[in-house]
Each structure stands twice: as C-alpha cells, then as structure tokens.
Amino acid sequence: MSWTEAEVRELKVGRYILIDDSPCRIVDITMSKPGKHGEAKGRIVAIGVFDNQKHSVVYPVKHKVKVPVITKKNAQVLSIANNEVQLMDSETFETFVIPVDPADLEKIKPGMEVPYWEAMGQRKIMLQN
C-alpha cells in the first residue's frame, strides 16, 4: 500500500492524487457551493504522471481520496537499447530497465546520473526540461 488518504477540500494544484489507480498531478481544482439538494462538490482535473493522460473526476468535498506516496531517487545509466534504459539505483545498487520516450533518449548518456520517480509499482525517469 503506497498511498495515503486526504479529503478533497485539502487538495491543491500541484499535489498528487490516485485516479483509476494511476498517480496524477492536479492541474485544476474547483469547488462548488453547497446546493439545495446536496453538499459542495470538488471537480479535479489531473495529468497522469506515467501516462501523461488527462483525467477528470468530481467528488463531494468531504470524500476521502487516495494520495500516492511518490519516492524520488537517483540512478546511474548503465546502458541504452531499443528505447529502454538500464539503470542502477544509487542507494540500493538495484538494476532495472525503464522504457523511455524516444525524444528523451538524446538527453541520456551512459554513465550519467538521472532522477527517477517510483509510485504504485511504476518507475519513470524525470529529466529537467
């Protein structure tokens, strides 16, 4: 279980939320006023961290949502082949392979240190733009 809980009213732009078991960064959040037939609602628009897809959900403001625990680490690039990068974690020395966008392959060279994020059993290299 690599997530915690938070109420919708506690969320802010730039924080993270789990939508359909996918970690997403909140890009817009709007709260409606309570109406005649119900409590206030929060509309959340978020972009997936790993899939870059736009997700949108509506919840009551008192509803508890899952917030992913994102671990930010560094790794050394060991090799690059077929749009995949083999990395070695700088702390645990664990080696693993991460698929990379072809546009980002030009920025990655063997031997360099790259930051990566890990959440919900997935990993992604987070290069500076």
From Swiss-Prot:
GO BP of this protein: positive regulation of translational elongation; positive regulation of translational termination
Subcellular locations according to the entry: Cytoplasm
Keyword Protein biosynthesis part of the UniProt annotation: yes
One Gene Ontology MF term: ribosome binding
SMART domains, per database record: eIF-5a (SM01376)
Keywords assigned: Cytoplasm, Hypusine, Initiation factor, Protein biosynthesis
Modified residues (Hypusine): 36
Signal peptide range in chain numbering: none
Transmembrane segments: none
Top-level division of the source organism's lineage: Archaea
Main localization, broad class: cytoplasm
InterPro entries: IF5A-like, IF5A-like_N, NA-bd_OB-fold, Rib_uL2_dom2, Trans_elong_IF5A_hypusine_site, Transl_elong_IF5A_arc, Transl_elong_IF5A_C, Translation_prot_SH3-like_sf
Keyword Cytoplasm carried by entry: yes
Job of this protein: Functions by promoting the formation of the first peptide bond.
Family annotation (HAMAP family): eIF_5A
Family according to the record: Belongs to the eIF-5A family.
Protein name: Translation initiation factor 5A
Source organism of the structure: Picrophilus torridus (strain ATCC 700027 / DSM 9790 / JCM 10055 / NBRC 100828 / KAW 2/3)
Gene giving rise to this polypeptide: eif5a
